[in-house]
Amino acid sequence: MSTLLIDLKGQELLAEEAELLAHPLVAGLILFTRNFYDRSQIQALIKDIRRRVKKPLLITVDQEGGRVQRFREGFTQLPAMQSFAAMISDPALQLTTAKEAGWLMAAEMTALDIDLSFAPVLDLGHECKAIGDRSFCEEVEPAVRLASAFIDGMHQAGMATTGKHFPGHGHVLADSHLETPYDERPSAVIFERDIQPFQQLIAQNKLDAVMPAHVIYRHCDSQPASGSKYWLQDILRQKLGFDGTVFSDDLGMKGAGFMGDFVARSEKALSAGCDLLLLCNEPEGVVQVLDNLKLEENPPHFAARQRRLQSLFKKKAFSWNELTKTRRWLENSKKLTALQQSWLDSK
């Protein structure tokens, strides 16, 4: 069963990387800034991956907008999610702009033959260093409206959506890239506020995937949400009725270290309810997992996991030349770049 998403070292596909990508446990890969030189190079890299690895691979990236945008030169400079509400006074225009940002981001990525950009961020608030202006808003209702519009744009471009970081990463000050954060707030606060964007968008059938946080919510469970049956099975699957894909966040992050070595982290995330696992920046860890992770031959959830994986591949795509000649792209690329520049100038 394919379950792992891995990364590449540089701007060309190495022979040993092609071999790893062909491993039965590998479902896909995630691209980073280090894999990018310019648009021609990244298109050539993706084409080479598709040609040399003889199976469907889910190719992903973090191209959220704002400070999390892996490809910049030659692409629209996408605005930070906070800028929609912070820089635009007209509520209707906020929603229109968010929708066009979602569409344009997804359309540019699918034009490269990338299937999925992990978006949108549904965390509330801007105090957490790891989140900051990646969050739409501090309040539930405007955050849900803006995220819903952004999602509509992504879906129009044929890209699946990933809500992150469940059940909410916005109110911890520690960065889970560097350590395991603890959220000390009462569980009632998390359920009344932080989980609401996920709950409401799941109810609206707008989330195709969810990525849990490497955060321990001390008054709810002793495990990080990414390795917690309570959060992923009892709450996400049972209470919220979510039937889409659950991605682990990067198991190479320091915040996942609470769960043990790389094999233990992978086992714990799968046991808790994750369908697909991200393991980045740890090439030796990837080899350890591929050599030692033991999966059931035909687990009862195998068919559901395969169905969920298939649903994440892009549904349609322009070529780059086709996309950049459309009126929608021409109008919105300029507007969105200008919005991001205004946002940066205001800070």
Swiss-Prot record:
Any one GO MF annotation of this record: beta-N-acetylhexosaminidase activity
Gene behind this protein: nagZ
One GO CC annotation: cytoplasm
Key word Hydrolase present: yes
Residues at which substrate binds: 62, 70, 134, 164-165
Protein name: Beta-hexosaminidase
Keywords associated with the record: Cell cycle, Cell division, Cell shape, Cell wall biogenesis/degradation, Cytoplasm, Glycosidase, Hydrolase, Peptidoglycan synthesis
Keyword Iron found: no
Transmembrane regions: none
Pathway: Cell wall biogenesis; peptidoglycan recycling
